[in-house]
Amino acid sequence: MTIHHDLSPTLNLIRLANGEGLDLPAYESKGAAGMDLRAAVDEAAPLTLLPGKRALVPTGFIFEIPEGFEGQVRPRSGLAFKNGITCLNSPGTVDSDYRGEVKVLLANLGEEAFVISRGMRIAQMVIAPVTQMRVAEITEASETMRGAGGFGSTGV
């Protein structure tokens, strides 16, 4: 018999006025890596994203991401495939010391206008560990089998 203990860190959220009535960000399945983020746009004024345009879409929440972690904002595959809606600067990083509203930078790469309505799942956030490294300047790089070979250097 396996006994599971929940030792997961807690993600504290502050609901802003524009987030009233929205579901909390949530994992939609037991194996989901990312929690869905919803649009906190005005119900009476949905946002229309024209082809080739971008918009910063509010989520209605401030995230208190635990120290040692980051939030990675990523596109939802269904929106990208079906409508050409994606996140720019993907993944977008939400640092653990950021205390403003989380917003999602969406772009319409499709051929038709796309309407973003209140509560629509617009992106996902993956919480991931962060390592901060010491930085040291050196005069020569160590040798490796690959060397300075870049794009395509290991084969197609």
Curated annotation (Swiss-Prot):
GO molecular function: dUTP diphosphatase activity; magnesium ion binding
Catalytic activity: dUTP + H2O = dUMP + diphosphate + H(+)
Assigned keywords, A-Z: Hydrolase, Magnesium, Metal-binding, Nucleotide metabolism
CDD domains found in the cross-reference section: trimeric_dUTPase (cd07557)
Binding, substrate: 76-78, 89, 93-95, 103
EC number(s) from the headed UniProt entry: 3.6.1.23
Pathway this chain belongs to: Pyrimidine metabolism; dUMP biosynthesis; dUMP from dCTP (dUTP route): step 2/2
GO annotation terms (biological process): dUMP biosynthetic process; dUTP catabolic process
The protein's required cofactors: Mg(2+)
One Pfam assignment: dUTPase
NCBIfam families, alphabetized: dut, PRK00601.1
Function (record text): This enzyme is involved in nucleotide metabolism: it produces dUMP, the immediate precursor of thymidine nucleotides and it decreases the intracellular concentration of dUTP so that uracil cannot be incorporated into DNA.
Family the UniProt entry places it in: Belongs to the dUTPase family.
Name by which UniProt lists this protein: Deoxyuridine 5'-triphosphate nucleotidohydrolase
The species this protein was found in: Rhizobium johnstonii (strain DSM 114642 / LMG 32736 / 3841) (Rhizobium leguminosarum bv. viciae)
Native organism taxonomy: Bacteria, Pseudomonadati, Pseudomonadota, Alphaproteobacteria, Hyphomicrobiales
Gene label: dut
